[in-house]
Regions:
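Bacterial N-terminal signal peptides
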Residues: 5-14
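Aromatic-Pro/Gly-enriched surface loop or interdomain linker
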Residues: 18-77, 81-84, 182-183, 187-217
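An acidic, glycine-rich "communication" segment
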Residues: 21-24, 29-33, 41-45, 115-191, ...
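Short alpha-beta junction capping motif
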Residues: 25, 77-116
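Surface-exposed patches in mature extracellular/periplasmic domains of secreted proteins
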Residues: 57-65, 108-111, 129-137
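Alpha-helical scaffolding within the catalytic cores
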Residues: 60-67, 84, 89-94, 159-163
Length: 217
């Protein structure tokens, strides 16, 4: 099952398939007490934006998946967020590594308070690798929408600049980590944070770039 799933991930998922076939993406449910369920309207709104503006054909309702489940191999893109603790068991860390090595992609959005726990747990997954900060010239910022200054700042907490990090296997980015940005907050329904339309649109455009980059690799 796992070997077959890895082959499927490696071969089938592309931007053209995201446009021409129904594709499902998922929200990661993790252990540790952190609020993995934060921003419940984020992914549905991003999906709607991408289907409208990128002409993707992503199922309107994201699935929820746990790392312990073989179902993770059914999703080319998994999103994780939250404000607090994350814990990966040894088997979950191994499953995530297999998923990423096999062609899957994980986007982690720090919703303020996730950073130290996420970095700790990723060392269980890839002890030999480091997150690499991405410059504004990276292609993920220059897909359908151009962000010449890199990751946009959506919500202000402590005056720090937003940062984007990638984790790479060979030359392929398999994980995109958005920090000090609150990107997913900008995808939420308008009345959740009452963000200006310009701010919300920036967040959705950056999210669309992530989707286009993932399916275009």
């Amino acid at each position: 099952m796992r070997i077959l799933s890895v082959i499927i991930l490696s071969v089938l998922f592309s931007f053209s398939s995201a446009q021409n076939q129904g594709v499902k993406i998922a929200l990661l449910k993790y252990s540790g007490g952190g609020d993995w369920y934060a921003n419940p309207t984020s992914l549905p709104n991003l999906i709607k934006f991408c289907n409208s503006n990128l002409k993707t054909n992503i199922y309107s309702e994201p699935s929820t998946v746990e790392l312990s489940s073989p179902e993770i191999f059914n999703f080319p893109f998994i999103h994780a967020t939250g404000h607090g603790n994350i814990i990966f068991s040894e088997s979950e860390a191994g499953n995530l590594r297999t998923y990423l090595e096999g062609g899957g992609f994980l986007h982690v959005d720090d919703n303020y308070g996730l950073d130290e726990y996420f970095r700790r747990e990723m060392k269980k997954v890839f002890p030999e690798k480091e997150l690499i900060e991405l410059p504004p010239s990276h292609p993920i910022f220059h897909q359908k929408y151009t962000f010449n200054e890199g990751l946009p700042k959506i919500h202000e907490h402590d005056g720090k600049q937003p940062q984007a990090f990638g984790l790479f296997i060979d030359d392929r980015m398999v994980l995109f980590y958005t920090y000090e940005c609150d990107l997913g907050d900008g995808w939420e329904d308008v009345d959740v944070h009452n963000d200006p339309e310009e701010t919300r649109l920036k967040a959705l455009k950056m999210g669309a770039n992530i989707i286009q980059f993932v399916f275009g690799q």
